[in-house]
Amino acid sequence: MEFKHVSVLLDECINALNIKEDGIYVDCTLGGAGHSSEIVKRLSSDGRLIGFDQDKDALKAAGERLKDYKNVTYVHSNFYAIYDVLTDLGIDGVDGILMDLGVSSYQLDNGERGFSYMQDAPLDMRMNRENEFSAYEIVNTYSEEELYRIIKEYGEEKFAKRIASFIVKNREEKNIETTLELVEIIKAAIPAKARREGPHPAKRTFQAIRIEVNKELEIISKTILDGVKKLNKGGRMAIITFHSLEDRIVKNTFKELANPCTCPSEFPVCVCNRKPEVKLISRKPIEASKEELEFNPRSRSAKLRIIEKL
């Protein structure tokens, strides 16, 4: 299957990075290189792009798309290793870092990867297929309490308790092996009236399991902090999120970097001596335009936040 993915907030991201032609830029989520192809177009031969992706299919597709550019370095790794990878590459400072935290259209639409609740496939959901831990292990080995926690916390699913109970009850008879088996169990757990309203009944549970498989939330804050250490003065970091859990982490981490003072509010002057490392470029998140929403409905929930290194 061809790796297709429509880049979200493309113009907004390029503007956010404030690209210098001889700068060094990092795309933490290279994907099909939609954003990166626009970044590298703006670089001279002295500029450089470092592209991370833990999905080998994505790296292969990006390599094909960017084959005419000799100043691109491809890294098969999760972006949480950004500091160590850049250090190993001999890079002390970069001028821009981009993170697009959405699952690519390719991964969602490619049924065999197990991300989709619309197509039957083995329970997988691994971004990096070299990892052994998959959705199958979560669904078939987590306790009812653990399932409830992740579905409630990561899926923000109000029927999390019933869904966890139904999963455990069903797997007593036989292991749950495919996405559509799981979908039917989720549907059975959710009252009929609720199933008829809102998004697909399995959407929130699938999101929760995917986040747990790939440890998506655990690594965001660390990556931001490590990335900022590598940003040159005036360098920008731009992050696109797609749900409230991610956005909250990005917003709060940016806020702490921009206003790290821990002194009580009644203190007349700061005595903790913690200085801001960044400034917020966008106090409110940038969202998709009406035009973008028309041709790319998946951009509806996208939010872009930007900081600049001081």
Swiss-Prot record:
| UniProt enzyme class | transferase
Which keywords belong to this entry? Answer: Cytoplasm, Methyltransferase, rRNA processing, S-adenosyl-L-methionine, Transferase
Tell me the GO molecular function terms.
rRNA (cytosine-N4-)-methyltransferase activity
Q: Can the keyword Flavoprotein be found in this entry's annotation?
A: no
What residues bind S-adenosyl-L-methionine, as annotated? 33-35, 53, 83, 100, 107
Q: For this protein, what reaction is catalysed?
A: cytidine(1402) in 16S rRNA + S-adenosyl-L-methionine = N(4)-methylcytidine(1402) in 16S rRNA + S-adenosyl-L-homocysteine + H(+)
Enzyme Commission designation = 2.1.1.199
Specify whether Methyltransferase is a keyword of the entry. Answer: yes
Localization, per the record, is: Cytoplasm
Which InterPro entries does the entry link to? Answer: RsmH, SAM-dep_MeTrfase_MraW_recog, SAM-dependent_MTases_sf
GO cellular component annotations, sorted alphabetically?
cytoplasm
Q: Which GO terms describe its biological process?
A: rRNA base methylation
Task: Return the SUPFAM superfamilies for the record.
Answer: Putative methyltransferase TM0872, insert domain, S-adenosyl-L-methionine-dependent methyltransferases
Q: Which family does it belong to?
A: Belongs to the methyltransferase superfamily. RsmH family.
Q: What does this protein do?
A: Specifically methylates the N4 position of cytidine in position 1402 (C1402) of 16S rRNA.
Q: What is this protein called?
A: Ribosomal RNA small subunit methyltransferase H
Source organism per entry reads Clostridium perfringens (strain SM101 / Type A)
Q: What is the lineage of its organism?
A: Bacteria, Bacillati, Bacillota, Clostridia, Eubacteriales
The primary gene name is rsmH
